[in-house]
Amino acid sequence: MCSIVILKQSDSEWPIIIGANRDEMQNREALPPGRHWEDRPHVFAGKDLTAGGTWIGINDFGVVAAIMNRMNSLGPMKNKRSRGELVLDALDHADASESLNAIIEIEKDSYRGFNMFIADNLNAYWIKSDEKNSLIEYFNIPDGISIITAYDRNDLNSKRIKTYLSKFALSSEPKPGRDEWQDWEMLLGSTYSDDNNPLSAMCVKTEMGFQTVSSTMIALPSFQPKVGSSKPIYRYANGSPDKVSFADMTI
């Protein structure tokens, strides 16, 4: 996964809303979200059929986790474990703080560099494992819009973030209780880039087969939601989001 957009609103009926695009080689097969792991029946996520892990998912406690590569760490490496395992590990816990504590205790050198997002309806974290740094770092995600790619959170050195941070900030925020997602659907499916580089777009399309292969939107309700909005909402586009519509998933 290469991009995750986070809207954190601590006092809202929906304190966490995320939109995430998975950028991958088109021929890397995956299953759409489901309960694919017999030893983890509490996990609902898409399954990468190459390595067996996942790029984003939710558990029955309302914890969401997602992972992205850091710069210059695309793809597997000999003697390194799959980073998709880490999402499953995070989703073994009952709240985001427990998940965070588990991830920061991993053997860092067993994995290539990554950015990770973990949240529940109270807390949200960005975890950074840079191959140039001996430590795993973590940060609280503040209220407002955040975008994480292979770069740091809201890092304007990322041309994608530089282009789309303001677009998401100025867009009409999703209203999950009313099933209103239009602006975010449009932005997640946008192939526009300021520099005409397809890799700088939110929705990636290249001639070499590397592209946005799916898109996910998740909303977490507060502890005291209004009638009709007590469960997380999970929406999924099984393909490029400029072509494939989002469908509501039954968790």
Per-region residue spans from a language model:
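N-terminal nucleophile
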Residues: 1-251
